[in-house]
Amino acid sequence: MDKSKQPFRKSKRSFRRRLPPIGSGDRIDYRNMSLIGRFISEQGKILSRRVNRLTLKQQRLITIAIKQARILSPLPFLNNEKQFERTESLPRITGTRTIKK
C-alpha cells in the first residue's frame, strides 16, 4: 500500500503520567485542611473528579471530608471575601421633612 493511500494515522506521542494529587501517606480526613483545600474552588465549591484527577473512591472520601469540615466549622460553606469588604456608602439624608402649621 502506498503511503499516499494509507488511512490517516495519528502520530504516537509519548505522554508523561501525571503524579496523583493524593500521595500514599496522605490521610483523607476533615482535620487535614491543607489536603482538603486543594480540592475546593475559590468560591468554596467541591471540584469535580475530572478536574481533581482522583479515583472514584478518593473523590467520595474527599467529598465526605469536606462536608464534615463544613459542618464542624473549620471550613466555611461559602468563601465570599466580598461579603466582608467595606464599600463607601452614600451619606444618609435625614430630617428633610418640614412640618407645616
From Swiss-Prot:
Residues 1-19 have a biased composition (Basic residues). Signal peptide: none annotated. It comes from the Eukaryota. The keyword RNA-binding applies. It is found in: Plastid, Chloroplast. Its main location: plastid. The keyword Ribonucleoprotein applies. Residues 1-24 are annotated as: Disordered. InterPro entries: Ribosomal_bS18, Ribosomal_bS18_CS, Ribosomal_bS18_sf. It holds the Pfam family Ribosomal_S18. PROSITE patterns: RIBOSOMAL_S18. One of its GO terms (molecular function) is structural constituent of ribosome. SUPFAM superfamilies: Ribosomal protein S18. GO terms for cellular component: chloroplast; mitochondrial small ribosomal subunit. One of its GO terms (biological process) is translation. Keywords: Chloroplast, Plastid, Ribonucleoprotein, Ribosomal protein, RNA-binding, rRNA-binding. Part of the 30S ribosomal subunit. Belongs to the bacterial ribosomal protein bS18 family. NCBIfam families: S18. This is Small ribosomal subunit protein bS18c. The lineage of its organism: Eukaryota, Viridiplantae, Streptophyta, Embryophyta, Tracheophyta. The gene is rps18.
